[in-house]
């Protein structure tokens, strides 16, 4: 094997071969550099999106916690008002009971006073005494009915106000989250 044709070929083609290798190396290096630049941009974009997502989730969590706190406060407030209404109802029931007892005593006294009168007065007194007893029973029944309807009315009012407060807090938090976006 004769090395001279190989050496002659290398001497003739070394410059174009060197330029070709240099150009290929420069192209590959540029391609790698460009890919790294794009990968960095994508990583930055992904990081920003992830950060925005975490911030949005944190804000949503805070809004939901605010709603839960507002709802819990409204329920607690409603329970306190219900307890106060029950106390007032119990006091009212005691007062109604006392009024009924006094009305019965008065009816009994009127009836006894009328029995001691003469016969004509006794007949007239019995009618008046019976009227007083009927009036006392009717007063007791009316007071019991009034108490029942007052309790129902108070209960409905408290439930409605609790719902309204919860609705207002949810609407307000929705308006705030809508305004911030």
UniProtKB/Swiss-Prot annotation:
- Could you list this entry's UniProt keywords, alphabetically sorted: Signal
Is Signal among this UniProt entry's keywords? yes
Give the Pfam families listed for this entry.
DUF2514
Q: Which residues form the signal peptide?
A: 1-26
Query: InterPro entries per the record?
Result: DUF2514
| Similarity field | To E.coli rzpQ.
Please state what the protein is called.
Protein gp55
């Amino acid at each position: 094997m004769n090395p001279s044709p190989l050496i002659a070929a290398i001497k003739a083609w070394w410059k174009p071969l060197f330029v070709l290798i240099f150009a290929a190396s420069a192209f590959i290096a540029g391609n790698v550099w460009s890919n790294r630049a794009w990968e960095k941009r994508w990583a930055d974009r992904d990081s920003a999106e992830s950060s925005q997502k975490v911030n949005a989730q944190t804000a949503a969590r805070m809004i939901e916690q605010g709603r839960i706190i507002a709802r819990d406060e409204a329920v607690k407030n409603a329970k306190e008002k219900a307890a106060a209404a029950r106390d007032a109802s119990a006091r009212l029931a005691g007062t109604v009971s006392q009024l009924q007892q006094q009305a019965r005593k008065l009816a009994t006294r009127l009836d006894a006073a009328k029995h001691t009168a003469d016969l004509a007065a006794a007949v007239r007194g019995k009618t008046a005494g019976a009227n007083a007893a009927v009036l006392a029973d009717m007063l007791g029944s009316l007071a019991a009915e009034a108490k029942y309807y007052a309790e129902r009315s108070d209960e409905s009012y408290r439930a409605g106000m609790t719902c309204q407060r919860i609705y207002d807090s949810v609407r307000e938090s929705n308006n705030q989250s809508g305004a911030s976006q």
